[in-house]
Design a protein with these regions (language model features):
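Long, contiguous interaction/recruitment modules in multidomain scaffold/adaptor proteins
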Residues: 1-51, 55
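TPR-repeat structural position
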Residues: 46, 64, 80, 117-120, ...
Length: 202
């Protein structure tokens, strides 16, 4: 299948995955003060409306936790583009959040679901980092493959699928699908490597 078709198909899988990744409230140590917002407690508990959180963020744009909560509201509303932007901002303004593994996965999933192609490379980088911290987590594995395919990082996708195979029952349909995927990815990785060699020749 074409790369374009593969990317479109990613959205369906990632839409399901992001529900799992972002399900439940985001708990973060060291809740910030929200004195400017009358319903501060609701925001801190994740119960405020998207509008209330957005209004609060205008007065506290560096509150990473609030950006994450705002992203969750946007995910619930199906606005993955806004969610991706909010999560990216959260990571930029709050170093602790930038290191949060679940936020890394949420960001990657939101970018892929929104088909923010300009951010595919960044999403792949972030998800790759998360995978390095939680390689045995099925969410990280699946999203790492999806992000690598979206970013056309074929060699990395091959590495992840190869690592997954030993943990899949060899007589299962999932194993056969994984093997077929691996063959496809290996072919694309080889083609990309050959193309790169051609480009560097004088």
């Amino acid at each position: 299948p074409s790369t374009r078709l593969s990317r479109v198909q990613l959205a369906v899988s990632v839409a399901v995955l992001i529900t799992v990744v972002a399900g439940g409230s985001y708990a973060f140590l060291g809740s910030p003060e929200m004195l400017e917002l009358t319903n501060a407690q609701k925001v801190m508990e994740g119960n405020a409306s998207a509008e209330s959180i957005e209004a609060y963020l205008k007065t506290a744009p560096k509150d990473g936790r609030a950006w994450v909560l705002f992203a969750h509201k946007k995910i619930e509303a199906g606005d993955f583009r806004a969610a991706a932007r909010a999560l990216r901002t959260a990571r930029e303004v709050e170093p602790k959040i930038a290191r949060d593994r679940d936020v890394m996965l949420e960001y990657g999933a939101a970018v892929l679901t929104a088909q923010e192609s300009d951010w595919y490379a960044d999403a792949n980088r972030v998800v790759k980092e998360a995978y390095g911290l939680m390689a045995d987590d099925p969410r990280a594995e699946r999203l790492a493959v999806m992000a690598a395919i979206a970013a056309e990082d074929w060699a990395w996708a091959v590495d992840v699928v190869r690592a997954m195979l030993p943990r899949i029952p060899p007589d299962s349909g999932e194993y056969m699908q994984a093997r077929e995927t691996l063959v496809m990815l290996e072919a694309r990785a080889k083609a990309a490597a050959d193309q790169k060699k051609t480009e560097v020749k004088p």
